[in-house]
Amino acid sequence: MSEQTKSVAKSISVLSIAGIICKLIGVLFSIPLNMISPQVATVFYIVYPTYTLLLTISSAGLPVAVSRLVAGFLAKSDKNNAWNTFRSAMIMLASIGGLFSLIMIVTNSLLVNMVGVEEASAGFYAIAPCVMIVCILSAFRGLMQGQQNMVPTAISQVIEQGGKVIISLPLAYLGLKRSVMAGAAGALLGITLSEIAALIYMFFCYRSKKPAFDSLPQNPENKPLSKKVLLRDLVVISVPITISACIVPFSQFIDSAMMIKRMLLAGLTSDQAKAAYGIFTSIVIRLINIPTALALAISMSLVPAIAACKARNDQAAVRKETDTGMRYAFLIGFPCSVGMSVLAGEIVRFFYGGVSKFSADQIQLASELLTFSAMTVVLFTAVQATSSILQGLQKQRIPMYTMIAGVSVKILLNYILIGTPGIHIHGGPYASIACYSVVMILNLAFVCKYAEMKMNWIDWIIRPGLAAAVMGAVVFLMHTLLPSNRLVTILEILIGIGVYLAAAFACKAITVDDLRSMIRRRAK
């Protein structure tokens, strides 16, 4: 295994561990927040989507663009243009972030009228500075990722999410003593303070790594590019990625406006439709998001690695990194999908079984939905990997078009299936599976075309799929023989991981080299 491939494997392992920790904290955060006050939690989750939408628009594509350009310049021994790219991106991100933060402050009353909750006013003020802070933070992350050093990004993500528990929950509790508005504002202010803590950490990482960056070689034949050219390149790369990142939230907005109405036509009462939609969004989607952290880890690692190979015109290395990325995508995605599907009921009860606001019937519905929704994990992981490979190959528009095609299928199927009696909310998982299947198939075709390689069916799909099937059979047998409780669920998951690794070794889906590379987490 080459040093470049080992670096990608190490990056994936570091970001995967951090991502899973962050997702688990995110799921667990909502439970104590609801215990402090359901009203505070309601206001929090009314304000938060507006923040995430503005954040996606302002900063989704630029960190990827920075990492790709920096990796490309460094591969050609051009540290000066790599540094100028970072500086240009920092100015752009700080300006855009500052503008969006100002918009949140100036349009506070308009936003409150839009959400229809007066208690949200202070919350919008509390989280407004966060947009600019995260934009600046993402510039530092892009620089580090461009050098293929994922440790600072991983640790800063844990700081962000840890702050939600350590800072947001106490502030929500203290604020609630005054009012619901103050409680929600306290929780949202905690998010801002958490991002400040993460930014401080990244700044110190940047300062400590700067001497090493300055000592990198500079090829005198590389001419400095103007700020205009660098800004143009950043925009050309980031805009399609940003649009792609906004497509899924846009489809979720359409779903929120359509799904309840379609369920009413399917024969459900208004209360039943609202409850079913709430179960799907607040339990199932939230649980599905936990393993998707692994997909994001793969995507962040692949973009700079592929871009560096592309910059050196090393097509053999491009094929090697593409093969490695896709193999890890399915190697991680298959067991997550199979495991979540087989243990859907146990997983739902593990997190939400003791939450009083959910009835036994609602927990059962969530379990049924998660059984099918779990299949989207392997598809989403493959979509993220293929999209990142295409972005690294300077084909960033293709994932945007394929995602539009997939989401169009999803919206159409949601409209048809959810409005069908006897299916209603169960159509949501089917539509999502169809969506990501379309995107994955299209992306794979383009990856094989532009990476100039053939689909590796055996290593990508057959071997990890077979290992996941063995794991699923063993876990299902345990599930039928053992009692259902949290301790047994943890035991089943741990044994499932062990069985999967053993089966993967047996069918050569994983090699000793793979395991060594993924365990090594030493920072560069």
Positions of PLM-derived features:
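Membrane-interface helix-loop junctions in multi-pass transport and translocation proteins
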Residues: 151, 162-200, 397, 407-441, ...
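Membrane-proximal transmembrane or re-entrant/amphipathic helices at the cytosolic face
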Residues: 476-524
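Specific pore-lining/lateral-gate transmembrane helices of multi-pass inner-membrane transport
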Residues: 72-89, 276-374
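Short membrane-interface helical motifs at transmembrane helix boundaries
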Residues: 99-121, 337-360, 413-415, 420
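Signature of the first transmembrane helix
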Residues: 7-64, 101, 105, 130-131, ...
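Membrane-interface junctions at transmembrane-helix termini in multi-pass inner-membrane proteins
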Residues: 135-156, 375-405
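Alpha-helical transmembrane segments of multi-pass membrane proteins
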Residues: 117-140, 358-386
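N-terminal membrane topogenesis motif
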Residues: 1-27, 80, 84, 221-248, ...
